[in-house]
Amino acid sequence: MLNADQAELDKFGELAHRWWDPNSEFKPLHDINPLRIDWIDQAISLAGKRVLDVGCGGGLLSEGMAVRGANVTGIDLSEKPLGVAKLHLLETGQKVDYRKISVEELAEQMPGEFDAVTCLEMLEHVPNPSSVITACARLVKPGGQVFLSTLNRNPKSYLFAVIGAEYVLQMLPKGTHDYARFIKPSELARWAKMANLEPEELVGMSYNPLTKKYSLGKDTSVNYLMRTIRHV
């Protein structure tokens, strides 16, 4: 059974043509992308690394890592965002191998073939996030790193990520997030350890509505990122 929610795939598919517009519904992704890429690059030095981007969508992270010199494969199950990602390569001349395949299926085909795996802003959109993490762990080489990000589940995250972002500030379309699918860091760490991944770093990502800027820091109460290493 495919670990995907068709309604979620359809939702992002309908918005796909605006993926690379920094003033569209994807503005938050454009705003956080440099922070995410810098964080990953500092941990593994992307140049020359073979990296898999799981849930790549329209390719913002995938292409950004390719610009830093990584050999990137991007996978997604939504046809339209993948089409947009491929078209954008024609504009920029970057090289990314985009494929429509589930992470679980790719793990059967290419176990242990990547220096690093990224799965950012995706886990809260699938029915079984632990299955995704297990597949990510299988795909990375022993000693390689898996980078994860999602939304914490607590009253503050509901207030900020759902009410604030979708209804008050209208930064995201209404219905972008389902609070019931938000994931506590302790849950993410447990799933990582079950998959033979050791959590090494936990970083929060905060938004300042006055400056309209994002920053990384210690506050993991809403958005957060986790860096893990696969045991040798």
Swiss-Prot record:
Tell me the NCBIfam families matching this sequence. Answer: UbiG
What reaction is this protein's catalytic activity? Answer: a 3-demethylubiquinol + S-adenosyl-L-methionine = a ubiquinol + S-adenosyl-L-homocysteine + H(+); a 3-(all-trans-polyprenyl)benzene-1,2-diol + S-adenosyl-L-methionine = a 2-methoxy-6-(all-trans-polyprenyl)phenol + S-adenosyl-L-homocysteine + H(+)
State the organism's lineage. Answer: Bacteria, Pseudomonadati, Pseudomonadota, Betaproteobacteria, Rhodocyclales
Q: Where does S-adenosyl-L-methionine bind?
A: R36, G55, D76, L120
Keyword Ribosomal protein appears in the UniProt entry: no
**What is the protein's known function?**
O-methyltransferase that catalyzes the 2 O-methylation steps in the ubiquinone biosynthetic pathway.
UniProt record similarity statement? Belongs to the methyltransferase superfamily. UbiG/COQ3 family.
This one is known as: Ubiquinone biosynthesis O-methyltransferase
InterPro entries the UniProt entry points to: SAM-dependent_MTases_sf (IPR029063), UbiG_MeTrfase (IPR010233)
Pathway given for this chain reads: Cofactor biosynthesis; ubiquinone biosynthesis
The record, for PANTHER family, names: METHYLTRANSFERASE (PTHR43464), UBIQUINONE BIOSYNTHESIS O-METHYLTRANSFERASE, MITOCHONDRIAL (PTHR43464:SF19)
Q: What is its EC number?
A: 2.1.1.222, 2.1.1.64
Q: A biological process (GO) annotation for this entry? A: methylation
User: Which UniProt key words apply to this protein?
Assistant: Methyltransferase, S-adenosyl-L-methionine, Transferase, Ubiquinone biosynthesis
GO terms assigned for molecular function: 2-polyprenyl-6-hydroxyphenol methylase activity; 3-demethylubiquinol 3-O-methyltransferase activity; polyprenyldihydroxybenzoate methyltransferase activity
Q: Which Gene3D superfamilies match?
A: Vaccinia Virus protein VP39 (3.40.50.150)
